[in-house]
């Protein structure tokens, strides 16, 4: 028996050594420390020798009666701390949870100007939350690619919310939010919201949200579908088109176009419904090509001082600019299209001043002379001039 047990122990020794050798790498791996961190640049990137005035938006804002705090990464929850008797307006279906005395909380469904907001495609169903004791609420959105941003309104600067669904929640007794109609943009982007007063705002954007701070004299060009909100300053944002390289080809004129336009056949053809339908189709194709192919050349120019909130993901050009605005910007010379408007206004002012100047000169005009005609007996007429100079 002793010999058998000795032989069994000798046969199991290789397995024991191999087992110890298998465990040794695991023990060595457990003793190693792996440290991973995100690299952060010390300074922002340079653009044409100047610092790009873009930074991340604020994650928290507070007032005497409330506090907004963005939680999570990438910013999936909004924590709202309310004092007693403070009202919180949040979009319907965005309330996640609430901590505090639930018996003191009152929640009602509020309709905020449903007629005007429905016409402008702005959400008008909001949940009004108030409590007689301090509470803390968590708010989120249904979309997984949105980012929160909080704005503190101190009453000195008003804001314009460019996106219809960007406003998520707000609080403040003196805060006023009024829908505004912007006819310069397309039907889907007619609705803007003007925010005035004091309070806190919670905005959401598609992708990541960034804040662009402009000083006096600085300019910033942004795509209109990327703009979430901006401060209301003068002058207002203007359409802008970048310059492009143009290769002009001069073809000698043979007068063929003028001859064809003067012919009766072309004149009669232009009055037919078929010709008008063809022109309308060509207009649609031209506008579509400008939106899809050259749509990256249509931007908005902001002049400082101003603060602009931009989002990393944007909508289509067709949802931002109307057909008329696309064609006007594309047909205008490169640069700021506001110059053409200023020239037209100046020309109109000159036309109004010319008749006024003529009317002013009428009372000052006086008779400088007088002519007297006399008929002689032979039928001849003689003129004698008399007046001031004689």
UniProtKB/Swiss-Prot annotation:
The keyword Transit peptide is assigned to this record: yes
Residues annotated as transit peptide in the record: 1-28
Family annotation (Gene3D superfamilies): Mitochondrial biogenesis AIM24 (3.60.160.10)
Region called Disordered, residue ranges: 348-378
Cellular compartments annotated: Mitochondrion
Domain of life: Eukaryota
Biased composition (Basic and acidic residues): 348-362
Keyword Mitochondrion: yes
Keywords, alphabetical: Mitochondrion, Transit peptide
Database matches in InterPro entries: AIM24, AIM24_sf, Trp_RNA-bd_attenuator-like_dom
Gene Ontology annotations of biological process type: inner mitochondrial membrane organization
One Gene Ontology cellular component: mitochondrial inner membrane
Family: Belongs to the AIM24 family.
Official protein name in the record: Altered inheritance of mitochondria protein 24, mitochondrial
Species, as recorded: Ajellomyces dermatitidis (strain ER-3 / ATCC MYA-2586)
């Amino acid at each position: 028996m002793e010999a058998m047990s000795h032989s069994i122990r000798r046969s199991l020794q290789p397995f024991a050594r191999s087992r110890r050798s298998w465990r040794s790498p695991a023990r060595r791996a457990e003793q190693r420390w792996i440290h991973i961190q995100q690299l952060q640049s010390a300074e922002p990137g340079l653009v044409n020798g100047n610092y790009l005035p873009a930074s991340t938006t604020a994650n928290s804002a507070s007032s005497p009666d409330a506090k907004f705090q963005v939680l999570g990464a990438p910013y999936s929850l909004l924590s709202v701390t309310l004092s007693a008797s403070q009202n919180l307006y949040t979009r319907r279906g965005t309330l996640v949870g609430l901590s505090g005395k639930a018996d003191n909380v009152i929640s009602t469904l509020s309709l905020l100007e449903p007629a005007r907001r429905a016409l402008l495609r702005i959400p008008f169903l909001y949940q009004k939350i108030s409590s007689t004791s301090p509470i803390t609420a968590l708010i989120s959105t249904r979309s997984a690619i949105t980012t929160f941003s909080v704005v503190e309104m101190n009453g000195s600067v008003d804001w314009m919310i460019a996106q219809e669904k960007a406003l998520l929640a707000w609080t403040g007794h003196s805060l006023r939010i009024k829908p505004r109609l912007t006819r310069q943009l397309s039907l889907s982007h007619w609705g803007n919201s003007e925010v005035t007063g004091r309070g806190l705002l919670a905005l959401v954007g598609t992708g990541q949200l960034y804040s662009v701070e402009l000083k006096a004299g600085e300019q910033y060009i942004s795509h209109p579908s990327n703009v979430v909100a901006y401060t209301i300053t003068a002058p207002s944002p203007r359409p802008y088109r970048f310059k492009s390289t143009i290769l002009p080809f001069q073809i000698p004129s043979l007068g063929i176009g003028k001859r064809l336009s003067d012919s009766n056949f072309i004149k009669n053809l232009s009055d037919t419904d078929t010709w008008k339908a063809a022109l309308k189709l060509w207009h649609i194709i031209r506008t579509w090509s400008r939106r899809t192919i050259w749509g990256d050349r249509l931007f908005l120019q902001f002049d400082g001082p101003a603060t602009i909130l931009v989002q990393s993901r944007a909508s289509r050009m067709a949802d931002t600019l109307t057909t008329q605005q696309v064609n006007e910007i594309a047909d205008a010379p490169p640069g700021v299209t506001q110059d053409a408007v200023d020239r037209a206004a100046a020309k109109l002012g000159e036309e109004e001043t010319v008749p006024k100047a003529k009317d002013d000169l009428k009372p000052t005009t006086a008779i400088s002379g007088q002519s007297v005609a006399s008929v002689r007996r032979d039928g001849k007429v003689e003129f004698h001039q008399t007046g001031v100079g004689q």
